[in-house]
């Protein structure tokens, strides 16, 4: 797994991704399909795309993927925040 510091780096970058989930998700899928064409076999509706950039379905699916990832990252961000607050309150003597 990632260290807390590595998670923080991911979360710091996520703000840029979050601004355009659908666009970034579409780009991730395009790169996946170009770099690993065999993965297209898992996606019947994308097998015969003529133009990935112009595909509204691909953009929608990219948004779905990025939204799911966003949920995971926000959960981790909350966990890191909670741990940080707990450590600070203990450091200040508020916890036994």
From Swiss-Prot:
One of its GO terms (molecular function) is oxygen binding. GO terms for biological process: removal of superoxide radicals. O2 binds at residue 61. It is an enzyme of class 1 (oxidoreductase). It is found in: Cytoplasm, Sarcoplasm. Monomeric. This is Myoglobin.
């Amino acid at each position: 797994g990632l260290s807390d510091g590595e998670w923080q780096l991911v979360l710091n970058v996520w703000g840029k991704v979050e601004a355009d989930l659908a666009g970034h998700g579409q780009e991730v899928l395009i790169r996946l399909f170009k770099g690993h064409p065999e993965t297209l076999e898992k996606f019947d509706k994308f097998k015969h795309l003529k133009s990935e950039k112009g595909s509204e379905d691909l953009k929608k699916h990219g948004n779905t993927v990025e939204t799911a990832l966003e949920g995971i990252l926000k959960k981790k961000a909350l966990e890191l925040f909670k741990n940080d607050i707990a450590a600070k309150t203990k450091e200040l003597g508020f916890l036994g």
